[in-house]
C-alpha cells in the first residue's frame, strides 16, 4: 500500500530535492534525495560531496532530516512581498554579493533545487539562493546597463572605492537602484507586530543611535520649530519609537512603485510618509557613511539606515498629528545652508561606502523609556555635524559590531527567549569618542528588541506613566560626561511572565547557572534572606553529585533497553541486581546466604566512585539524562518547537538540578533518541572515533570498539566483553586491582579458555562469592580495630588535641524525642552545610553501610571513622575509586567529622536544642547548663569517660560482627559436605603440589600472553 509523504515545511519529497540529513557521526550535511520508496515510507539520501557508498535509506518522517533553510512555522503567511515575485531567466534583479550588499545582476538560469544562477554586471557568475535576490524597480532597469554594460558595477573593496574605475554618475545610479528596490520592498511591509518583528531580529539584535546633547541648542543661531508627534503604532506592537522626521534630503529621483503593497487599515494613509522618509535617509547615506568620527559605532551593513533615522532628530512633542503632514512639513523646513554644506562634500561622498538593499527599510523603533524632553535637538546642529564630518573625514570608519549578549546561532534567537530574559547590563555600550562637530557629548541609547508576543497580559511600555520610568532616566546631561540609557526599566521586570519568574526562582540556588552571575535572578528572589539563599545554594549543589551518578546509571539502563541500531553493532545488556546484605537472616540462612548479590555498578566511563553517602538527599523518582554538550537555557521557553528542532547539533541540558524537574515528559521523550546518539562514544585502540564495520560495545563503560582492532570476529564475540581500558585502567595500582574486577567479585565468574568445556568458576560461583564476602568482612573488622587502637591512644593521652571531639556523650535518643520540627530543621540545615561541602570537595564521599543502620559503629560520629564491614564489601564491589582516594579518605573523614561535630555543637549551644547526628540522623542532646562553671580538668575527665564509653560500644559491635563472620565460615565449610568429603584435606600436605600447579599456571599464562601479543599485530 502506497504511503503519502508527510507535510514537513521546507522539505520537498521528490527525487532531486535538496535537504539536510544527519549521518551516523551525528553531523548535518547538505543532501539530495536519490530514490523514494513509497511502500516503506523512506528515501535514499545522498550526502553531497561524499561517495555514493554512504547513501542511506532514511524514513521520511525521521528527525534525521531537516530543510536546508529552516522555516519557522509561526512565520508562515507573514512573508514579505518579495517572496511572491516569480523571477524569470534573463530578468534584471538585485543580487547580494559577498559583502552583503545588493548589486544589479541578471538571472542566467533557474535551477531545480530553487537556486538561481545570476551574472553580475561585472561578469561574475554565481549561484544564489532565492533569499539573496531582490526585484529591481522598473524605472531602474536598463538605464545603468546602457551606460556601462559590464564594467560599472564591481564589488566594493573595504577602502570604499570601486575595484575598477567608474564615474560618479554610475555610482549615483547604483545607489539609486539599490535604495529604490529596498524602499519599494520594505515600505509596504506589514505593521510591526510581535510576530513580524522577529524577522528583523536576526539582522539587528541591538540598534545603537546617537543624539547630540541638549547643550548644543544654545549654540545654534537658526532654530526651526517643528511640531512633531509620536507615531501611532499598532496596539499589538510593544515598542514605542522615537521616529525621525527632520531629515535633510539629497535630491534624487524617486522611483515609482509598480507593485501593490498589502497594508493594514490603520496604516492606509502612511505609505507616502514612509516613502518620503526612506528617500531622505537614502540620500543621507552617501554623506553619512563617511563617518561622524572614527569611534562612531556601527552595526552591520543592513543596520545603518535605522540607526541614521533614529539618530538624526527625535520628536520633542507628543501631539497627535497625521504622519503625511509631518513628512510634508519636514520637506519644507530644510534650512537654506543644507544644500551648500552637502554639496561641498559631494565629490567625496560618491566614493564612500553606501548602505543599499534592504538596509534602508529595516526601520525598527527602539523600546527605550526616554521622555521627549531629554532628546530635543536642532536641525542646524545635525547639519553642521554632517557637513564637518564629510569635509574632514575622507575614509569611512571601520564598522564595529557591538558584542552580542548571546553566543548561540542566529537561528536560536526566538521571541520567547528575549521575552523572558532581561538583557544583561554589560550589553549597554557607551560611545568612546564624539564627533568633531559636537562638544564631546553624545547620548547613546540601546534599543531593546525584546518582543513579548508570548507573554500574556503584558502592558505596552509606551503606555507606562513616566513616573515608573523615572528612575531609569538620566536627568542631567552634564559637561564631559557620557550618559547611557539603561537597557531595561524597573517596570520591565514586573512585566515578565510568571513562568520566567518561576524559572528564575528555581535557578537561583544553582551555583552553575548564569542567572546568579548576571544578576538576573535578583528580582525574582527579592524576598529571600541572605542566609536562606546560602542554605539553598548548598542544598542544591550537594545533591548534584549524587544526581549525576543516578542519571548516568539510568541513562545506561535506558540505552540497554534500546534495541534499534542503525548500524550493525553488538550491544550487550547488563543485568543489574540490587544488593541485599542483611545479616539478620543468618540464623535461618545456609545456602541462601551464598546467593547475595552486590550493588549495581554506577560508574560511567572515567568517573570516580559513585555517591553512596547517606548525607546526600533522596533523589526523586525520575531523572533526566545528562548530555555531552550543554546549552544555557535559563529562562527559556523549552516548549518552543522551533527551538527544539534547531537544537540538533547541541543537546539540551535536561537536568532536574536547574529546573527542579519541572519539565513536561514530552520534551524528555523527544530528546531521548538524540541524547542516545550523542552519547555513543567510540574509544578504540586505533584512536579513531569513527564507526566502521562491525562494532562491539564494552559492558562496563558502554564505549564502542572496532572488532577488527580488538582481534575479534562476529562469531567469536565472548559472552562477556570488557574493553582493554576497563580490564586494565591506566594509572591503576595493582593493590587496587580488586576494585576493578567487578564481575569476578559480584558473580564469581572468571574468564576461561574457550576450549575448556567446563569452567571451574562457573561451577563454583557461589563459593567464590561467599569467600569474597568473608574476606571483605574480615577486612572491615580489621579497619574498625585500627580505629579503636587510635582511639585508645587518645584515651591514654589526657592532653590530646582531638579529645574534645568526645565532649558530647554517645547517648542516643530516638526520633520521637525531638523537641520540635523547626528545631530539627535548623539543626539538619547546619549539618547539611558541612556535609554538602564534603561531598563536593572529595571524590570519595563517606560510604553508606549496607543494612547496618541500627548498629552503633555505623551511627557513630567518632574520631577517624574507619571503613566498616559493610563499607568494605561495598568498596570491593565498587570499581570507581583507586588507592589514592583510600589513602587520604581516613584523614578527610577525620577532618569532616571534626567540622561537622563543631558546627553541631556550636549551633546546638546557640539554639539550646538537640543536634542531628551527621551519620545516622539520631538525636544527641548536649546539656550546657554548667558550661560557664565547669572546671577544665572536669571537662577533660568527662571527655575521657565519653570516649571510653564509645570504645566499649564499638568493642561490643566488633564482637557481634565476629559472630557473623564465624557463621559465614560455617556456611563455607558446609559446602565440603556437598562434595562428599566429610573431612577437609590437610592444606599443608597439599602445599608442594599447589606450588607446582601455580608455577605451571604462570608459565602457561606467559605463553598465552605471548601468543596474544603476536596475534594482535
Curated annotation (Swiss-Prot):
Residues 186-197, 315-346, 444-454 have a biased composition (Polar residues). GO terms for cellular component: NSL complex; nucleoplasm. Residues 198-218, 496-505, 530-565, 908-918 have a biased composition (Basic and acidic residues). GO terms for molecular function: methylation-dependent protein binding; zinc ion binding. SUPFAM superfamilies: FYVE/PHD zinc finger (SSF57903), Tudor/PWWP/MBT (SSF63748). PROSITE patterns: ZF_PHD_1. It is found in: Nucleus. The keyword Iron-sulfur does not apply. Disulfide bonds: none annotated. This is PHD finger protein 20-like protein 1. It comes from Homo sapiens (Human). The lineage of its organism: Eukaryota, Metazoa, Chordata, Craniata, Vertebrata.
Amino acid at each position: 500500500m502506497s504511503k503519502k509523504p508527510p507535510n514537513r515545511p521546507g522539505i520537498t519529497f521528490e527525487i532531486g530535492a535538496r535537504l539536510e540529513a544527519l549521518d551516523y557521526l551525528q553531523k548535518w550535511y547538505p543532501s539530495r534525495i536519490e530514490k523514494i520508496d513509497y511502500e516503506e515510507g523512506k528515501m535514499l539520501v545522498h550526502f553531497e560531496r561524499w561517495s555514493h557508498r554512504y547513501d542511506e535509506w532514511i524514513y521520511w518522517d525521521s528527525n534525521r532530516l531537516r530543510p536546508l533553510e529552516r522555516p519557522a512555522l509561526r512565520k508562515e503567511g507573514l512573508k514579505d512581498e518579495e517572496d511572491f515575485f516569480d523571477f524569470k531567466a534573463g530578468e534584471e534583479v538585485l543580487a547580494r554579493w559577498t559583502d552583503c550588499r545588493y548589486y544589479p545582476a541578471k538571472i542566467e538560469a533557474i535551477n531545480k533545487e530553487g537556486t538561481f544562477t545570476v551574472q553580475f554586471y561585472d561578469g561574475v557568475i554565481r549561484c544564489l539562493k532565492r533569499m539573496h535576490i531582490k526585484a529591481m524597480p522598473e524605472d531602474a532597469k536598463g538605464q545603468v546597463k546602457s551606460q556601462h554594460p559590464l564594467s560599472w558595477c564591481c564589488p566594493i573593496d573595504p577602502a570604499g572605492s570601486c575595484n575598477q574605475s567608474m564615474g560618479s554618475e554610475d555610482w549615483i545610479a547604483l545607489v539609486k537602484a539599490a535604495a529604490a528596490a529596498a524602499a519599494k520592498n520594505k515600505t509596504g511591509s506589514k505593521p510591526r507586530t510581535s510576530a513580524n518583528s522577529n524577522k528583523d531580529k536576526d539582522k539587528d539584535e541591538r540598534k545603537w543611535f546617537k543624539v547630540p546633547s541638549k547643550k548644543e541648542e544654545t549654540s545654534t543661531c537658526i532654530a526651526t520649530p517643528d511640531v512633531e508627534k509620536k507615531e501611532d503604532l499598532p496596539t499589538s506592537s510593544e515598542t514605542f519609537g522615537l521616529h525621525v522626521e527632520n531629515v535633510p534630503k539629497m535630491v534624487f529621483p524617486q522611483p515609482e512603485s509598480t507593485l501593490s503593497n498589502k497594508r493594514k487599515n490603520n496604516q492606509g494613509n502612511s505609505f507616502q510618509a514612509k516613502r518620503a522618509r526612506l528617500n531622505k535617509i537614502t540620500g543621507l547615506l552617501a554623506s553619512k557613511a563617511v563617518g561622524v568620527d572614527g569611534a562612531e559605532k556601527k552595526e552591520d551593513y543592513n543596520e545603518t539606515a535605522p540607526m541614521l533615522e533614529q539618530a538624526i532628530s527625535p520628536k520633542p512633542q507628543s501631539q497627535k498629528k497625521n504622519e503625511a503632514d509631518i513628512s510634508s512639513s519636514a520637506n519644507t523646513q530644510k534650512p537654506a545652508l543644507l544644500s551648500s554644506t552637502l554639496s561641498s562634500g559631494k565629490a567625496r561622498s560618491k566614493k564612500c561606502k553606501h548602505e543599499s538593499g534592504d538596509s534602508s527599510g529595516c526601520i525598527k523603533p527602539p523600546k527605550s523609556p526616554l521622555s521627549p524632553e531629554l532628546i530635543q535637538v536642532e536641525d542646524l546642529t545635525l547639519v553642521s555635524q554632517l557637513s564637518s564630518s564629510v569635509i574632514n573625514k575622507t575614509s569611512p570608519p571601520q564598522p564595529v559590531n557591538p558584542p552580542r549578549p548571546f553566543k548561540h546561532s542566529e537561528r536560536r534567537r526566538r521571541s520567547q527567549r528575549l521575552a523572558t530574559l532581561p538583557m544583561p547590563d554589560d550589553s549597554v555600550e557607551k560611545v568612546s569618542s564624539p564627533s568633531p562637530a559636537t562638544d564631546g557629548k553624545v547620548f547613546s541609547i540601546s534599543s531593546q528588541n525584546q518582543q513579548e508576543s508570548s507573554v500574556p497580559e503584558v502592558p505596552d511600555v509606551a503606555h507606562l506613566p513616566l513616573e515608573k520610568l523615572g528612575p531609569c532616566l538620566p536627568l542631567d546631561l552634564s559637561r564631559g560626561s557620557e550618559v547611557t540609557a539603561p537597557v531595561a526599566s524597573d517596570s520591565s521586570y514586573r512585566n515578565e511572565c510568571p513562568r520566567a519568574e518561576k524559572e528564575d526562582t528555581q535557578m537561583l540556588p544553582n551555583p552553575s547557572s548564569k542567572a546568579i552571575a548576571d544578576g538576573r535572578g535578583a528580582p525574582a528572589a527579592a524576598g529571600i534572606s541572605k542566609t536562606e539563599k546560602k542554605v539553598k545554594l548548598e542544598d542544591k549543589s550537594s545533591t548534584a553529585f549524587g544526581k549525576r551518578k543516578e542519571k548516568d546509571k539510568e541513562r545506561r539502563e535506558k540505552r540497554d533497553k534500546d534495541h534499534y541500531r542503525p548500524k550493525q553493532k553488538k550491544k550487550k545488556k547488563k543485568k543489574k541486581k540490587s544488593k541485599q546484605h542483611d545479616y539478620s537472616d543468618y540464623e535461618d540462612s545456609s545456602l541462601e546466604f551464598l546467593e547475595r548479590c552486590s550493588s549495581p555498578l554506577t560508574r560511567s566511563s572515567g568517573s570516580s566512585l559513585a555517591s553512596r553517602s547517606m548525607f546526600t538527599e533522596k533523589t526523586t523518582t525520575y531523572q533526566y539524562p545528562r548530555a555531552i554538550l550543554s546549552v544555557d537555557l535559563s529562562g527559556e521557553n523549552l516548549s518552543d518547537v522551533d527551538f527544539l528542532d534547531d537544537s540538533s547539533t547541541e543537546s539540551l541540558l535536561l537536568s532536574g538540578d536547574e529546573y527542579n524537574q519541572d519539565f513536561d515528559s514530552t520534551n524528555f521523550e523527544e530528546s531521548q533518541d538524540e541524547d542516545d546518539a550523542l552519547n555513543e562514544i567510540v574509544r578504540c585502540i586505533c584512536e579513531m572515533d569513527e564507526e566502521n564495520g562491525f562494532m562491539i560495545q564494552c559492558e562496563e563503560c558502554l564505549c564502542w570498539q572496532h572488532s577488527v582492532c580488538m582481534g575479534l570476529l562476529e562469531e567469536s564475540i565472548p559472552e562477556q566483553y570488557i574493553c582493554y581500558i576497563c580490564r586494565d585502567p591506566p594509572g591503576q595500582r595493582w593493590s587496587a586491582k580488586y576494585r576493578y574486577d567487578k564481575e569476578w567479585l559480584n558473580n564469581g565468574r572468571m574468564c576461561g579458555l574457550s576450549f575448556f568445556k567446563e569452567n571451574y568458576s562457573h561451577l563454583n560461583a557461589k563459593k567464590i562469592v561467599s569467600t569474597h564476602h568473608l574476606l571483605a568482612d574480615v577486612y572491615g573488622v580489621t579497619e574498625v580495630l585500627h580505629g579503636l587502637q587510635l582511639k585508645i591512644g587518645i584515651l591514654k593521652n589526657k592532653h590530646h588535641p582531638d579529645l574534645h571531639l568526645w565532649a558530647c556523650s554517645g547517648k542516643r535518643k530516638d526520633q520521637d524525642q525531638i523537641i520540635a520540627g523547626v528545631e530539627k530543621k535548623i539543626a539538619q540545615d547546619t549539618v547539611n552545610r558541612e556535609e554538602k561541602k564534603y561531598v563536593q570537595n572529595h571524590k570519595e564521599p563517606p560510604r553508606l553501610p549496607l543494612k547496618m543502620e541500627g548498629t552503633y559503629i555505623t551511627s557513630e560520629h567518632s574520631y577517624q571513622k574507619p571503613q566498616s564491614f559493610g563499607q568494605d564489601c561495598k568498596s570491593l564491589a565498587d570499581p570507581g575509586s583507586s588507592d589514592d582516594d583510600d589513602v587520604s579518605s581516613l584523614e578527610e573523614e577525620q577532618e569532616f567529622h571534626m567540622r561537622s561535630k563543631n558546627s553541631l555543637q556550636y549551633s546546638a549551644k546557640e539554639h539550646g536544642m538537640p543536634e542531628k547526628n551527621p551519620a545516622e540522623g539520631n538525636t544527641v542532646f548536649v546539656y550546657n547548663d554548667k558550661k560557664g562553671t565547669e572546671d577544665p580538668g572536669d571537662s577533660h575527665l568527662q571527655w575521657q569517660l565519653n570516649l571510653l564509653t564509645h570504645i566499649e560500644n564499638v568493642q561490643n559491635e566488633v564482637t557481634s560482627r565476629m559472630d557473623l563472620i564465624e557463621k559465614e565460615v560455617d556456611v563455607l565449610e558446609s559446602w565440603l559436605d556437598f562434595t562428599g568429603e566429610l573431612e577437609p584435606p590437610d592444606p599443608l600436605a597439599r602445599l608442594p603440589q599447589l606450588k607446582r600447579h601455580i608455577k605451571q599456571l604462570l608459565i602457561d599464562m606467559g605463553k598465552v600472553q605471548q601468543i596474544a601479543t603476536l596475534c594482535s599485530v
